From Swiss-Prot:
Protein keywords: Glycoprotein, Hydrogen peroxide, Oxidoreductase, Peroxidase, Secreted
EC nos: 1.11.1.7
Coiled coil: none
Any one Gene Ontology cellular component term annotated for this protein: extracellular region
Family that this chain belongs to: Belongs to the peroxidase family.
UniProt-recorded name of the protein: Peroxidase B
Protein's organism: Aloe vera
Length: 188
């Protein structure tokens, strides 16, 4: 990113605008935004969407661990010096598992379920339980949106197969990956 946009702290916004503007709703082509570590996902994407306007494009946003800058050799040696063998094995296994989740994240999980009309089959959510709250249920479960539709931190929706039509939020596998840069291994 820095090589493509010299002199800028972040050019993710410029790249995202380019990707979003290349989407064509008539032909069904989709764009993809790849980003690396160190960016505030929600703030950057919100800036982009404010400039180009809210769209209904299905934009897959996921973190790619291969974009992270390599650590200097001195930092790596100092880190390994204070770690025990079991720590290295455990962290390596965790990093591999998290990398696998990040690489397959966009393929497995819907980020914008409102773009999937087939999931909105239950028009009378809650009517079988209590008729007095049907209107509330329909409004709440059908229109309650996330803080940011492109957020990867809040959890991804899993749609219930019951006649309630409610959304069950589960933990996001990418958000659960440990940020190894936050570990203070030198002061254990």
């Amino acid at each position: 990113v820095e090589m493509a946009c010299p002199g800028k702290v972040s050019c993710l916004g410029d790249k995202a605008i380019t990707v979003l503007s290349e989407n064509n709703p008539l032909t069904g082509t989709k764009g993809e935004i790849r980003m690396g570590d160190g960016f505030n996902v929600e703030e950057e994407i919100e800036k982009v969407l404010e400039q180009v306007g809210k769209t209904t494009f299905d934009v897959a946003l996921y973190a790619s661990g291969s974009w992270k800058k390599p650590q200097p050799l001195a930092v790596m040696v100092a880190t390994l010096a204070v770690m025990q063998v079991r720590d290295v094995v455990w962290l390596s296994a965790l990093a591999m598992a998290c990398r696998l989740l990040m690489d397959t994240f966009a393929e497995k999980y819907f980020l914008q379920p409102v773009l999937q009309p087939s999931y909105e089959l239950f028009k009378n959510a809650g009517s079988n339980m209590d008729g007095t709250v049907t209107s509330f249920d329909n409004i709440y479960y059908k229109t309650n949106s996330w803080a940011s539709p492109l957020s990867i931190r809040g959890g991804y929706p899993m749609h219930s197969t019951s006649n309630m039509g409610s959304q069950i939020y589960q933990d996001n596998p990418v958000a659960n990956c440990l940020d190894l840069s936050s570990l203070d291994l030198a002061n254990r």
